[in-house]
Amino acid sequence: MNLNQVTLPALDVAASVAFYRGMGFVQIVDSVHYARFQCPAGDATFSVHAVDSAPLQSGVVIYFECEKLDQQVDALEAAGYEFSTRPRDERWLWREARLTDPSGNVLCLYHAGANRKHPPWRMPAP
């Protein structure tokens, strides 16, 4: 199996489209109630779909990997994006920064290098 995409709820699809396009994601599907994006690097996609009310915070965080995290955050801040957490080194060996989209979905921009899939505590292959 391979993960195809993640779909996020959007209170205002047009606002979400502007938000994600402004971050550099490429919109590949457009409709009144739904939009789908491809990540600028790699093959991953995600989408937003219209909802009438914001779901309760579920604890879900969407992670987007950035090769040059600090520069990416600086560029987004210069463009008006507000981060709840500036880039910082975490104990799990990732560098992370967090923000929310217009519907309150939590996003984490991060850089992990080899630790993304191969942290020191990785389980041995079966």
Region locations from a protein language model:
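Short strand-connecting beta-turns/loops that link adjacent beta-strands
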Residues: V13, D30, A41-G42, W92, ...
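Short beta-strand-to-loop elements that line the ligand-binding cleft
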Residues: L8, I28-V29, R86-D89
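Alpha-helical macromolecular-interaction surfaces
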Residues: A15-A18, Q71
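Conserved short beta-strand elements that form part of the metal-binding/catalytic scaffold
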Residues: V26-V60, V106-G113
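Vicinal oxygen chelate
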Residues: N2-L11, V51-P126
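Conserved acetyl-CoA-binding loop of GNAT-fold acetyltransferases
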Residues: R21-I28, Y81-E82
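N-terminal beta-strand motif that seeds the catalytic metal site of vicinal oxygen chelate
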Residues: M1-A14, V60-I62, A112-P126
